Amino acid sequence: MRTYRKFTKDQRSTFPYWFWHWLAFNDVARELHVWRPHHILHDIEKPFLRLVFPYKKVQKWHRLHNRHHLEYRYPERRSWLDMIIDWEASGRTKYACPRNAIEEARFKLNEGSMSPSDYTQFYIVWKELADRHPQLEKHSV
């Protein structure tokens, strides 16, 4: 497994953060044997939007327009698989994300930012992956 550079919250708007997160996202997808060509474009708009807009605006736009976020504007089209990959990858590159995907989903459910029905849909996809890749449950993906 690759050693990843970790970033603070203040560093998340930088190109190096985006690059290391992109590497981690694609590595997790490969490790779980679910990599798809569209993963090459993961978060690709962020460094370019960041050249023009402040980070908070880029972050809000990104979450509304990308299927791997709970805030995605078409909830019925969310990609739970990509969300799992993203949350697993975040733990590799952010100091502020110590949780793995299932821990993050439970946290969001408990804080109210994830509905019980969303959690159920997420859990079905996560459980199928965890059955094939037990390391998901052990926080070592």
Provide a role label for each language-model segment.
Residues 1-141:
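Metal-dependent phosphohydrolase cores
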